[in-house]
């Protein structure tokens, strides 16, 4: 299995994503936003940061980058796509995930560890966790308030698309939502950073199982 780690001007978690992929036992390669092909890749990791300086709004300019059409193609083919923080914002901007990310209710940038709950462990991203398991991931965002209409929220609930919730909501997200998947279950976006949660020495290794779950799910289908 080989992951593409997208790199935009202003990305600052691409190395963490690369390391997470390698640590999970697969290949990874950085892919510049100006590229026009993701041929040969089995999945996409869209890292956090401040793509294009968050001009217009977070993820807006990245959403029209040349590589995005290929991200949509891989998603349509059922390949795994994970967007974290700014990556989540990009996924909502390009329509692969519903809703939007707004400014935190506090209007402050939040950077700290947060306790989260796995509320759906029947996805390609969470199947190595226990249902209801509590995990610790770092958060680092100013625009992490997940917002959606009541209609979309009911669809998310009906389809079990909500996978991760905050135990102590730090940003005002609708129903404490921290992470969701698309209806097909192969595209995932979350504001917390599992790629920064790989070593107990650094405070938490709760994120290891998420990347291992992605690899496990892919291998079950292709090996």
Swiss-Prot record:
Q: Where is the Glutamine amidotransferase type-1 domain?
A: 3-223
Question: Which SUPFAM superfamilies would you find in this protein's record?
Answer: Class I glutamine amidotransferase-like
By its UniProt entry, which InterPro entries does this protein fall under? Class_I_gatase-like, PRibForGlyAmidine_synth_PurQ
Major localization listed first in the record, in broad terms:
cytoplasm
What does the entry list under GO cellular component?
Answer: cytoplasm
User: What EC number(s) does the entry state?
Assistant: 6.3.5.3, 3.5.1.2
The record's listing under Pfam families reads: GATase_5
Instruction: Return the SMART domains for the record.
Output: GATase_5 (SM01211)
Which residues of this protein are catalytic?
85, 193, 195
Molecular functions per Gene Ontology: ATP binding; glutaminase activity; phosphoribosylformylglycinamidine synthase activity
Kindly tell me the pathway this chain contributes to: Purine metabolism; IMP biosynthesis via de novo pathway; 5-amino-1-(5-phospho-D-ribosyl)imidazole from N(2)-formyl-N(1)-(5-phospho-D-ribosyl)glycinamide: step 1/2
Cellular localization per UniProt: Cytoplasm
What does the UniProt function comment say about this protein? Part of the phosphoribosylformylglycinamidine synthase complex involved in the purines biosynthetic pathway. Catalyzes the ATP-dependent conversion of formylglycinamide ribonucleotide (FGAR) and glutamine to yield formylglycinamidine ribonucleotide (FGAM) and glutamate. The FGAM synthase complex is composed of three subunits. PurQ produces an ammonia molecule by converting glutamine to glutamate. PurL transfers the ammonia molecule to FGAR to form FGAM in an ATP-dependent manner.
What subunit structure does UniProt give?
Part of the FGAM synthase complex composed of 1 PurL, 1 PurQ and 2 PurS subunits.
Q: Which PANTHER family match?
A: PHOSPHORIBOSYLFORMYLGLYCINAMIDINE SYNTHASE SUBUNIT PURQ
Supply the name of the protein.
Answer: Phosphoribosylformylglycinamidine synthase subunit PurQ
Q: Which organism is this entry from?
A: Staphylococcus aureus (strain bovine RF122 / ET3-1)
Its organism's taxonomic lineage begins at: Bacteria, Bacillati, Bacillota, Bacilli, Bacillales
């Amino acid at each position: 299995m080989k992951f593409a780690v997208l790199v935009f001007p202003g990305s600052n978690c691409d190395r963490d994503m690369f390391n997470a992929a390698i640590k999970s036992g697969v290949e990874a390669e950085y892919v510049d936003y100006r590229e026009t092909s993701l041929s040969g890749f089995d999945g996409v990791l869209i890292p956090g940061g401040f793509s294009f300086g968050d001009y217009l709004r977070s993820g807006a300019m990245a959403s029209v980058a040349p590589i995005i059409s290929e991200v949509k193609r891989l998603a349509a083919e059922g390949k795994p796509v994970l967007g974290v923080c700014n990556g989540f914002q990009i996924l909502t901007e390009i329509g692969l995930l519903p809703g939007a990310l707004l400014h935190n209710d506090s209007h402050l940038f939040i950077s700290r560890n947060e306790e989260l709950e796995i509320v759906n462990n029947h996805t390609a991203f969470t199947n190595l966790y226990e249902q209801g398991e509590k995990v610790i991931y770092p958060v680092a965002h100013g625009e992490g308030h997940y917002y959606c209409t009541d209609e979309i929220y009911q669809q998310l609930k009906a389809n079990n698309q909500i996978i991760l919730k905050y135990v102590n909501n730090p940003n005002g997200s609708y129903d404490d939502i921290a992470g969701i998947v698309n209806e097909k279950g192969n595209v995932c976006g979350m504001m917390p950073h599992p790629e920064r949660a790989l070593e107990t020495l650094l405070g938490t290794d709760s994120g290891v199982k998420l990347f291992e779950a992605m690899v496990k799910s892919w291998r079950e289908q292709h090996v």
